[in-house]
Amino acid sequence: MKIMIFICGEGLGHTSRCLALGKELLNAGHEIKFGAYGYSKELVEKTGYTAQEIPSEIKLVGKAGSLDLTGSIEATLKSAQLLGGPKLLKLLREFKPDVVVSDSYYLGTLAAMVLKLPVYLIINQSNMEEFFKNRGVPVRIIGKLTKKFYKEVFEKTDKIIIPDYPLPYTVCRKNLNFAPKLRGKLFYSGPLVREKYEDIDSIPLEKPHVVSLIGGFGYREPIFRKVLTTAMLDPGINYTLISGPSLDPSKLGGVPKNVRILNFVEDTYPYIKSSDAVIAPGGHSTIMEALSFGVPILSFPDEGHSEQESNAAVVEEEGYGRMLSYSTPPEVILECIREVIEDEAYRNKVERLQRLSGELDGPKTIRKLLEKEIGKKAS
């Protein structure tokens, strides 16, 4: 099969799971082409693949730990490319894919529909209108239009893939709200993780060890400072902080001896596997990675980001970790760290999800789905 994979470039989690799927499809002998932009395109190319530049779709901005929704809308409109649609149509006509897999990239989804190509949409949120609640009147109007738009798209896609555990273990379940007539299109693949647990070697981290995966947006810097202060309260707990491309670790001031700060790390899996707890925002893909490696989570969702807050709430409710906020003081953060490290109930639950992730094998499951539903038509 020839498969076009479109990737939303806001948030590297979309890219990570598409790379997991692309690797599986390539290993099975299929021809694929990635379409991406921004950090997403850079990560695809750093991994060793080529990526076709596609128009940007959404641009997120924020400050002091909070997502600036109005600013994000303005930034998105300013960066919008008027000829984006024709460019995508040209790309699809030249590549002639048998199927388009779109990870939350709706411009590419629409282009595929125009050309009457099969479309498999990967999403971990369907209730995007929640993003716009309790905002100013113009933003609320955008929310209503958004709901109508997504409803039309969902009805026209061939399949909606949820890259999460099936119910009752679905972490993104609070972000899903589909009409009953769409339930037949839903496919819970299991987590799309780039590496299998058994294929990753552990690294020697001084125990107990907490790994922070907060990165990507400069407005998350307050968490770094909170974690550094937390580390000073108990030198017996060790930390590795992976900063991400938008943060400058040199501006963080004094670093305790029990803390190691690393710049952007391409392969975080050895760190996750070797840790006793992971500090992360509420992003879906990062949570999937931690759970697939059997590690409890301390989640700091971006304030005002309803999708992340909902994911973190499920982590808290199900006992996979704790939900914290940017206002949580270091003393409380430390107690939460001690709790998830010392209480075996957390470890037992996440180890169950680690086993389940391996059994589901999300990338392989989607490959088989495409081969069954598209492969026969393509051959």
UniProtKB/Swiss-Prot annotation:
This is Uncharacterized glycosyltransferase MA_0452. Gene3D superfamilies: Glycogen Phosphorylase B. Belongs to the glycosyltransferase 28 family. It is an enzyme of class 2 (transferase). Its EC number is 2.4.-.-. One of its GO terms (molecular function) is hexosyltransferase activity. InterPro entries: Glyco_trans_28_C. SUPFAM superfamilies: UDP-Glycosyltransferase/glycogen phosphorylase. Keywords: Glycosyltransferase, Transferase. It comes from the Archaea. It comes from Methanosarcina acetivorans (strain ATCC 35395 / DSM 2834 / JCM 12185 / C2A).
